[in-house]
């Protein structure tokens, strides 16, 4: 009887919302944006499930849409209002969604799609073609109103089958490919099906799509009617090492006269005769006068090869360039070569582009000299809300003071590689911009150690929401115990600044008396470490109280082979992050930490021991909900795989619900993760270039192995 009474009470409590008219119920449900909240509502009853499907506007598929479980769903499985569909993360990740390549060749990837969709191997090209058409039609039937599509494309077959079903509505497309471009593919063939079919296309995103610059130029110039309608074009090109030349940038701009957003890597190296210079920039501005967002960057060059020569861009050329773009709001020019005496160009930017709000500059010298009381250079851009300056060697504390006086609306500020800036300049800027500044980035500035930087940010400690810094510990200011990976209180007798503090409350010398408050609004924290450095000193350096910190990103770079072997019982220090009470998301990126994947020489540690060093203590993060992990690599053998110590440590994170490994691993290692009680969403992503081409040769994890693990994962009973 008691159970029946509880059921009746539950029905009466839910009847209030279920008795609402259908339009009002749909309107209420449309306000639920959190995915899990919508899922909970959909599980309540059939009417709520139908309402959730009717109002869902975006969806990212993680499973295998080629499997019988999806292909033979009831026709009631339909999302009539869904506009954004992401197919770039379908399982197994990186394998062709639709492919005409027989699975028996060395191209890899065909076997999983054929076997997973029909339960038997289909080798005949006609059978594969029919299968592709059926899968594409099933997707179009489930999601009839798609206007924005993201998809992983190993070859043009996927687009050739999908785009005809949404050709009238498709306005935005993002292509993803981290594998090598098929060498026999004609130039521009990857984009051919898209530009030929989708007349309504307005936005094209290739920021994570590896291809050649020749492909882009050929595709855009041979379809003038389609490209003339484009308003947003992102040509970031995943892992691009070469940018667009002057002879390529001009035709692209001429083919897309209505662009409002353009992102492109360019060749600015003056040693090349076809580099982008003043004439190319002016031609770009003349061809696309409506640009509001323009982001041009020079692909990263190795330090051994780079020489800080002058770029082929002059101040006079920039002045003419800005004069031709009056609507510009967001401008990025991140160069590896110097532009000298850039202050007049920045003043022209403020004068000619009055709407400018977001500005990112790399290797621009003389941005703000601040030699007199009047403002000069970038400081006259009073409408800026975001400013990021990189490798500006003559930027000083006085420059920051002038920027603080002139740019009073700044909410985001960042410097990278500015070696003359000190903590005094950062503190003065923070004090001046206290009412507006919310996000700060300080990276690789020679005179700014981490503790000094945190101290300098004390004026906005209670207001800042996002912080990105590189961790450089001043060993002369650390106790020996901190340098060895442990933390203890400082000895008051060792503090040379005793006259500043009260003797009963002395702190470490990098802690100021007015820095005892908490980081009340800090929600996102990004940390950069060189290989072998410790996280442990971070807490005692000033980041001890972050009550609302939700997300942390840790990036480690360097050659572990040159690092001394850590002392016994010395660990990186992830357990220190357990003091953040609501930490839910972590990105731990060791992809640029290089070591020995196989047997290491005497006295050195292989990658498995380095993974143990960095991951030890991660089980202490009881609130951790989502983890993205990039394993370290051995570039000599192109090895980026999860080792047994890493698997054993990660599987002890009992609170994890989402786990994404950006690398490979062995199938029997995956069974460890089944012991994580609430793990619901997991994926192996080889989203780095070049991703392994052939599962049978270069990766430990086969597609069939992953699908078997996925069945085990999805068959578990999740408590919540």
UniProtKB/Swiss-Prot annotation:
Main location: nucleus
Chain coiled-coil ranges: none
Gene3D superfamilies per the UniProt record, alphabetical: 1.20.1280.50, Ribonuclease Inhibitor (3.80.10.10)
GO terms classed as biological process: auxin polar transport; bud dilation; negative regulation of seed germination; positive regulation of response to water deprivation; regulation of meristem structural organization; regulation of shoot system morphogenesis; response to light stimulus; response to water deprivation
Alphabetized InterPro entries for the sequence: F-box-like_dom_sf, F-box_dom, Leu-rich_rpt_Cys-con_subtyp, LRR_dom_sf
GO cellular component: nucleus; SCF ubiquitin ligase complex
Effect of residue 21 to S: In d3; dwarf and high tillering phenotypes
F-box domain residues: 14-60
Annotated keywords: Leucine-rich repeat, Nucleus, Repeat, Ubl conjugation pathway
Signal peptide range in chain numbering: none
Disruption phenotype: Increased number of tillers and reduced plant height.
Cellular compartment(s): Nucleus
Spans of repeat LRR: 71-134, 135-158, 159-189, 190-218, 219-247, 248-279, 280-316, 317-344, 345-372, 373-398, 399-435, 436-452, 453-510, 511-537, 538-571, 572-606, 607-644, 645-720
CDD domains recorded: F-box_D3-like
Tissue occurrence: Expressed in leaves. Expressed in roots, culms, leaf blades, leaf sheaths, shoot bases and panicles.
Effect of residue 36 to W: In d3; dwarf and high tillering phenotypes
Role noted for this protein: Involved in strigolactone (SL) signaling. Required for responses to SLs and the establishment of arbuscular mycorrhiza symbiosis in rice. Strigolactone-dependent association of D3 with D14 and D53 (a repressor of SL signaling) triggers D53 ubiquitination and degradation. Controls tillering by suppressing axillary bud activity. Tiller is a specialized grain-bearing branch that is formed on the unelongated basal internode and grows independently of the mother stem (culm) by means of its own adventitious roots.
Summary of subunit composition and partner proteins: Associates to a SCF (SKP1-CUL1-F-box protein) E3 ubiquitin-protein ligase complex. Interacts with D14 in a strigolactone-dependent manner. Interacts with SKP1, SKP5 and SKP20.
PANTHER family membership: F-BOX_LRR-REPEAT MAX2 HOMOLOG (PTHR13318:SF245), PARTNER OF PAIRED, ISOFORM B-RELATED (PTHR13318)
The protein's name: F-box/LRR-repeat MAX2 homolog
Species this protein is from: Oryza sativa subsp. japonica (Rice)
Gene designation per UniProt: D3
